[in-house]
Amino acid sequence: MALKKASLACAVCGSRNYSIKISGNPKPTRLEVNKFCKHCGKYTTHRETR
């Protein structure tokens, strides 16, 4: 199956700072990663958005 684009949005401010490619298969949970948010100026949880 083809890869799909998804964004990682900051859980605090909601800005979409990162884009990733994921497999097209639906998953029950969304990806959560700790990454640096340039708008908040600190490391926060980023969640997958579609």
Swiss-Prot record:
GO BP term, pick one: translation
Domain of life according to the entry: Bacteria
Gene3D superfamilies per the UniProt record, alphabetical: Ribosomal protein L33 (2.20.28.120)
GO cellular component: cytoplasm; ribonucleoprotein complex; ribosome
Molecular function in Gene Ontology: structural constituent of ribosome
Record-linked InterPro entries: Ribosomal_bL33, Ribosomal_bL33_sf, Ribosomal_zn-bd
Pfam families for the chain: Ribosomal_L33
Keywords: Ribonucleoprotein, Ribosomal protein
Family: Belongs to the bacterial ribosomal protein bL33 family.
Protein known as: Large ribosomal subunit protein bL33B
